[in-house]
Design a protein with these regions (language model features):
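Metallo-beta-lactamase
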Residues: 4, 9-85
Length: 85
């Protein structure tokens, strides 16, 4: 399932696989951080909104595979990601 997640860029998308309970997030969210928003079409407000409405509404055990660094889970990021509090 394609999740439109603008913020890092206007056309940002994540790809959720319900059967495997995983989401490929690109630069939307990282383990303990979020993607840059200083691009022409980036928006910090839109990014946080996308994370809260699209990523954090997935099941807590959903594995998140970001474009950089280590994988994480929805539950972990909801609890520990300082950028999303």
């Amino acid at each position: 399932k394609v999740l439109h997640t603008p913020g890092h860029t206007l056309g940002g998308c994540c790809y959720y696989d319900e059967a495997d309970s995983c989401c490929f997030c690109g630069d939307t969210i990282f383990n303990g951080s979020v993607g840059r928003t200083d691009f022409y079409s980036g928006s910090a407000r839109a990014l946080i909104d996308s994370i809260q409405k699209r990523i954090f509404t997935l099941p807590p055990d959903t594995k998140l595979y970001p474009g950089h660094n280590e994988k994480t889970t929805v539950a972990y990021e909801m609890k520990y990601n300082p950028c999303c509090r």
